Amino acid sequence: MKTETVPPFQETPAGSSCHLNNLLSSRKLMAVGVLLGWLLVIHLLVNVWLLCLLSALLVVLGGWLGSSLAGVASGRLHLERFIPLATCPPCPEAERQLEREINRTIQMIIRDFVLSWYRSVSQEPAFEEEMEAAMKGLVQELRRRMSVMDSHAVAQSVLTLCGCHLQSYIQAKEATAGKNGPVEPSHLWEAYCRATAPHPAVHSPSAEVTYTRGVVNLLLQGLVPKPHLETRTGRHVVVELITCNVILPLISRLSDPDWIHLVLVGIFSKARDPAPCPASAPEQPSVPTSLPLIAEVEQLPEGRASPVAAPVFLSYSEPEGSAGPSPEVEEGHEAVEGDLGGMCEERKVGNNSSHFLQPNVRGPLFLCEDSELESPLSELGKETIMLMTPGSFLSDRIQDALCALESSQALEPKDGEASEGAEAEEGPGTETETGLPVSTLNSCPEIHIDTADKEIEQGDVTASVTALLEGPEKTCPSRPSCLEKDLTNDVSSLDPTLPPVLLSSSPPGPLSSATFSFEPLSSPDGPVIIQNLRITGTITAREHSGTGFHPYTLYTVKYETALDGENSSGLQQLAYHTVNRRYREFLNLQTRLEEKPDLRKFIKNVKGPKKLFPDLPLGNMDSDRVEARKSLLESFLKQLCAIPEIANSEEVQEFLALNTDARIAFVKKPFMVSRIDKMVVSAIVDTLKTAFPRSEPQSPTEELSEAETESKPQTEGKKASKSRLRFSSSKISPALSVTEAQDKILYCLQEGNVESETLSMSAMESFIEKQTKLLEMQPTKAPEKDPEQPPKGRVDSCVSDAAVPAQDPSNSDPGTETELADTALDLLLLLLTEQWKWLCTENMQKFLRLIFGTLVQRWLEVQVANLTSPQRWVQYLLLLQESIWPGGVLPKFPRPVRTQEQKLAAEKQALQSLMGVLPDLVVEILGVNKCRLSWGLVLESLQQPLINRHLIYCLGDIILEFLDLSASVEESAATTSASDTPGNSKRMGVSS
């Protein structure tokens, strides 16, 4: 025997001799046993009593050897090795049926809860596809997380929660038992709260809404695929919709005792075991589609178009020998398939016949004033303030009449820069009644009008309208629906049948038709040339920050785009664009260009804006400095656009809002915005523009202007309010003082009290010190938590506050093999305490765990696997569909209130279903009546909606913990904190 392999206490000679003696004694015993066996066999042939004695000895020997073979070091008996307990076999047909039911549920949700409101603001067909893809991604992520979830740990936590609930209810019942008469629900709830800590969500209705909103936000952040719901506004809207319209009503429904009875009947019914998958007929479903749930569908009104003509009755059990779906369920499935088929046909046919609030297709290269891209007030675009264009002083119908004169009249420009600030838009490619495509390319030069000349100009345009009516053979293509506005008093007497014509606002003077072409470009998606770029003026606006309102300057960038083609005709076709950017966005453009190695080499010799303290709230500068900075920025943009590689880069085109929305701020790091967010925002904004085309914008600068007017002399105040121009497509609504039309228009407000907004040198030093401290603290600072996010302790510890567990799973040895069985036996003994007190003694509990511990563990594992099998998930989805869409159709009217007799019948059936949870042998041993009393206590504890609501929130905390959404939330929080650095304008009130 080797020394290194033998423990120290066996290295002595005495230890070796003991080992040899034991070995020899075991051999002697074996020899004696064999000898006695031969003797007994011989005597068997002589005496029958010896046969009985031999049988008894064999039983004892089998028990002794069997316990040593079936048991382990702990002394437990593994009876599950002798009792077969099989789980549901994997069935491919069940997986396919689950996929079908998931897709069916998603389509019905989109049909009844998404498109029902989205079609009121837009008819974009791609939105439905994007929403369906996003929901499928959410379901796939949820299934992935559930597949890796520890089902045994979840079951143990749920059993612990049930045990805590029963113990607390028994204590509350004993506390209120001494009162005369029936116990009030409020008194029972107070006693229940004294026995256990209630969930924070049930403290008050406001706390419930806040907590539910946080849970929904947590689920969306962890499950919704990127980049959906990345925008703060979009996520807030979706969270509110789901919280108020889905989760809160669902929790109210789940806490209803009658609904709990129906669910228990559906889950634990005797007919719950699915039929095995037939190999020869894969088209048959693997589970019975006759749901164990009675759900009466109310008779629909006569005027309601529904494919279901009769109420659907769902049986509690499936008839024997029936493998196919019942006719009632088939009828419901046909109804759903018919509705979904009609919905798909709607998608295929399109919505060309309906009236659009806004055009579905909008050319990104050709923009007009009504859809002019907007510049944000800050990097995050916190405010959306609409302005009106100078041309809005004229009626749109009068401006439309000018398009008839462009093909027949040669107009000379009033000044050299008559085309300054012109803009055009390519509307949707709709068709006229004759089926011909309609072109909606416009040229919209700005109009600067004095109030004294307004009536004269409108009179001239009215004459143009008369000339248009006299020549009916000259027709203009229909204008986009986004340009349709109400007629003014000047043209209220016109023929209402006058077809809408192309918008073209031009200055009061001749305009050369050889300069611009009013036909759409042949290939707007092709490469374009950015030319004639200039910064025409500045706009002063204010933004709100932590310390109040701060003024800042916006620079109006205007440029033209033309097709980059060699075969272009002599008449150069142009499109005009305008975008407002602040100084910080110019710095962001320079930073993003420098961060790209392939573009950095092209901008080495380009002089960009200075980066010295760009984020300090130094107040608004005077007009001279603004003019100098404007010239520098204009030179910077011209140099960039002169380099083809830079001009065609994504950064420059995003900065100039060539293919994007200028309402989105140009930030240092670009972020992905999902198509769903873009389509929803576009539809809502377009609807608001159409609904309120001439509403007065609420400008943040109007208050500033009024304050300045009060502080200024009377004559100066009148001079400032002489002429106001408003831009309908900008976020800023400043008051612009324009005295005369100039070749190069400069919009600049001389703000009053600018010195008060400027930091002194000491204040600047103090500010820099604070920012330095923030930068030093940033790496160790924890990310900010959402106030609506559920407390992490609540999610992590499941029932730590809601209910004190009878047995903490974390304190038990993780290596034990009967953790789940021990928890279940504790719960069972709690139920049996009043009926079998002798069974709940300490010695009896040890005996039960020793003999039946592993068997109960195996039985629970099989039950958990069966309850989470694909066959069961199909059944759960069918129950959900029948609860929300009875017969496959969302009811227009609420269901009739269930009578008290129906509720009592459902309670009795639920009790009978719970009786079938335990094996029949166990029920016979314990006694049927006593088992019925114990299960009756379980149902009695679920008769209070407030207690049920507490249980639902605790159960939700358990599920959230095991879904492991913390990693996704931490990643999202890290992204948010990275964007909200200490130098961010949102925190510091930057005014550059």
Swiss-Prot record:
Residues 709-719, 782-795 have a biased composition (Basic and acidic residues). It is a peripheral membrane protein. One of its GO terms (biological process) is establishment of localization in cell. Disulfide bonds: none annotated. One of its GO terms (cellular component) is cytoplasm. It comes from the Eukaryota. SMART domains: PX, PXA. Its main location: membrane. It holds the Pfam family PX. InterPro entries: Phox_assoc, PX_dom, PX_dom_sf, SNX19_PX, Sorting_nexin_C. Residues 410-442, 692-726, 778-797, 973-992 are annotated as: Disordered. Residues 418-428 have a biased composition (Acidic residues). Gene3D superfamilies: Phox-like domain (3.30.1520.10). Keywords: Cytoplasmic vesicle, Endosome, Exocytosis, Lipid-binding, Membrane, Protein transport, Transport. A 1,2-diacyl-sn-glycero-3-phospho-(1D-myo-inositol-3-phosphate) binds at R582, R629. Residues 95-272 form the PXA domain. It is found in: Early endosome membrane; Cytoplasmic vesicle membrane. Residues 980-992 have a biased composition (Polar residues). One of its GO terms (molecular function) is phosphatidylinositol binding. Residues 533-663 form the PX domain. Belongs to the sorting nexin family. The PX domain mediates specific binding to membranes enriched in phosphatidylinositol 3-phosphate (PtdIns(P3)). Interacts with PTPRN. Plays a role in intracellular vesicle trafficking and exocytosis. May play a role in maintaining insulin-containing dense core vesicles in pancreatic beta-cells and in preventing their degradation. May play a role in insulin secretion. Interacts with membranes containing phosphatidylinositol 3-phosphate (PtdIns(3P)). This is Sorting nexin-19.
